[in-house]
Amino acid sequence: MKQDVIKFDNEIYQIDVFMENKSGRMSCYYIDSSNPMLVEVGPSKSFPYLISSLESLGISEVKRSAMTHLHLDHIGGIGHLVEKYKEHFVYIHELGIRHLPNPEKLWKAVSDVYTEEWLSTNWGEIKPTPTKNIRSLQDKELIDLGNGRKLEAIYGPGHAKHHYTFYDEYSKTLFMGDTLGLIYPHGDFVQPNLPPPDFNKELLFNTLDDLKKLD
């Protein structure tokens, strides 16, 4: 299975999960600290690529993940991850506690935009995630990465009302989800990401202003 993994400084790995079977469409991130963290999982159809890349790094178990928001291109594979690693738990906006165990409403909302056939073909169906495997995030919550390293959860609506950005102060890295829009690896074009019904321009600009204040 094809793999595309980039190692950055401070033990951060970018993993291309070949969303829609194309490179450069969706990345997940693995922070290989003493208390590791996976950021994003991608859609269900991309799950085999994620696992293959993790195993190529010698990672046989993933105990924790953090999701920026509840859109299926970012969280669709969570149920698969929990099925594979029974003790795994995911940090996510509090709405995740309602929707991940019963993802039918998430599926319906997205299929109204993309159609069920397109979703099934390109992203794959989402599996339920048991409530016991879900941790709801609080704004400014600090998640322990070990050895004094923390991942800060920063609530940042605009793209979606359930959106968080994660800040690793140790490496000065922001994991921004869709806050900045769609940024492709080969070119300077940035496409705003404006999904119905949650997109709010004013809130998005407020979020960006807040993030600019980070050290």
Predicted regions mapped to residue ranges:
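Active-site neighborhood of phospho(di)ester-bond hydrolases with catalytic His/Asp-centered motifs
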Residues: 39-42, 63-69, 91-93, 156-158, ...
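Glycine-rich phosphate-binding loop signature in dinucleotide/nucleotide-binding domains
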Residues: 57-60, 145-149, 214
